[in-house]
A protein has these predicted regions:
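A fold-level detector for beta-propeller and closely related beta-sheet-rich head/sensor domains
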Residues: 1-495
């Protein structure tokens, strides 16, 4: 063990049994409760997500190794570390700065920069801004259980990682936000290594687009691209098509006991963004007339299917209605042009859960085809390997597909009788470059100065094992189209 770090000054609250009231505290003051004899695991420590970003020069020499983490339900704030200093004789240099609720990181009296954070549930991001600075991006989180409470502030905070002061670069407030801002996703839309856009939703059901393309942070702005009524508590995913991006997210929450027991209908959305301000989607009164194509989800035993509807009604995107009690609380994973969405449904009064993993065609929200990245779901009727199954006419069925109603169809997903989370692993990925072919640019990885991300998101570069690994070490393998040895055209590769 080289380092043990506790952000002990982080503000939080505890329930005082003597007065039946919430009282202010810090993580350091609460640490003693974790060691008490009767402790039963009912307190939060540092349970938020974190992002790791290693920065190297064009010779692969390490320049920085940043870690930016959120407190989650353990406190109202975030912390930044520089792990490149972990081998130094003075470990105090590892700690860069903390971001705390109701504090002003630049130590002046300008209240416009004052931080108003709730519990920072989710995962922050790190990205390179247009000015050339590396920055940490933090959502305001949730201050109050009641979504309509004025204590919930909806804002995106951006901090300079070039120094140890935590100097604020920007505070972008959403004036009509509701319920607090959820985790953001950073996007490099032109794949040049710098962040242009951030997307994030709020618990009121809205999705926002933060424009970060100007080199002057004072000119950064935010607008609504989707208006709804269902809580958005996880970061969206992004899929890059020929002439637009698809912002993919689900609705639902499991933050509180009431949320876990809630069985209201929730949805998965794919909202088209072609950089035009007129493309706002309003689904607050339902799908009809919203410009969204509604695709229908069906389940046969444990296997999931989406229909292949395309009637021209989806000019602004698509939507999938989930079954009663299902919800989405984690960021989808995009593989080629398929979004794999983890869907949770609680049962047994919240003590148990089932998990559905659903692959969705990002272009229309519907069925998968042999030209899609697709799951190889369990089942006697599904081709598990090449030559495993044939049609009634003797034709070989592609891996991951099956014959159904005289046609070859590819199942969209599968339902597991257990609560699991998944992580995508690709045997052929030889580095951890954090910018994807779709432009998702804020996650963990090594950013090599001067390197450009791959642009192909239509086919796999070669044969290899690709899987969604579950946290219980089970897995759901993925297959899809292979790129040809000879390129026919740039259009085939990129679009």
């Amino acid at each position: 063990l080289k380092l043990s770090y506790i952000p002990g000054t982080m503000p939080r609250q505890y329930f005082d049994n003597d007065t039946s009231a919430l009282k202010d505290s810090t993580l350091a003051q609460e640490l003693r409760t974790f060691a008490e004899k009767g402790y039963v695991g009912d307190r939060y420590g540092v349970d938020g997500g974190f992002v790791l970003r290693r920065i190297t020069d064009d010779q692969d020499k390490q320049k920085h190794f940043f870690m930016f983490g959120a407190m989650g339900l353990g406190g109202r704030g975030a912390y930044a570390l520089d792990l490149s200093k972990i081998d130094s004789s003075n470990l105090t240099g590892v700690s860069m700065f903390d971001v705390q609720n109701d504090k002003n990181n630049n130590n002046n009296k300008n209240d416009s920069n004052r931080v108003k954070l709730g519990y920072t549930v989710g995962t922050p991001q790190i990205g390179k801004t247009r000015s050339g600075k590396y920055a940490a991006f933090l959502a305001s989180g949730y201050a109050a259980k009641d979504i309509g409470s004025g204590d919930n502030k909806t804002a995106l905070y951006v901090y300079d990682l070039n120094n140890t002061l935590g100097t604020p670069i920007a505070k972008i407030e959403v004036k009509d936000g509701k319920g607090g801002l959820s985790s953001p996703t950073l996007v490099d839309k032109d794949l040049d290594g710098t962040v242009d856009i951030a997307y994030a939703g709020d618990r009121g059901g809205n999705m926002y687009r933060f424009d970060l393309s100007n080199s002057d942070p004072n000119k950064w702005s935010v607008r609504t691209i989707f208006e709804g009524t269902k809580p958005i508590t996880s970061a969206p995913a992004v899929s890059r098509l020929k002439d637009k991006r698809v912002v993919i997210f689900g609705t639902g929450s499991d933050l509180t006991e009431d949320d876990v027991l809630d069985t209201k209908e929730q949805y998965i959305y794919g909202i088209f963004d072609d950089d035009k301000a007129a493309n706002n989607v309003n689904a607050s009164r339902g799908v009809l007339g919203s410009g969204l194509l509604e695709q229908h989800l069906t389940q046969e035993n444990k296997t999931l299917f989406l229909n292949k509807r395309s009637d021209g009604s989806g000019s602004k995107g698509w939507v999938v209605k989930l079954k009663e009690g299902q919800r989405v609380t984690v960021k989808p994973t995009v593989v080629l042009r398929t979004a794999f969405v983890t869907i949770r449904k609680y049962k047994d009064d919240g003590c148990g859960a089932e998990t559905a993993i659903l692959g969705i065609n990002t272009a229309d929200g519907g069925a998968l085809t042999p030209r899609s990245a697709r799951p190889i779901v369990p089942g006697d009727q599904v081709a598990q390997y090449s030559g495993h199954k044939t049609t009634s006419k003797g034709k070989s069925i592609p891996i991951g597909c099956m014959e159904k109603g005289g046609k070859t169809v590819c199942p969209n997903g599968y339902v597991y009788d257990k609560p699991v989370n998944v992580r995508y692993l690709d045997e052929k990925k030889t580095d951890d470059f954090p910018v994807t072919a779709d432009g998702d640019a804020g996650g963990s990885g090594t950013f090599k100065e001067g390197k450009k991300p791959a642009r192909n998101n239509r086919c796999f570069s070669g044969k290899g094992v690709r899987t969604l690994l579950m946290n219980d070490l089970d897995s759901l393998d993925i297959t899809g189209p292979m790129c040809g040895i000879k390129r026919l055209s740039w259009r085939e590769v990129f679009f």
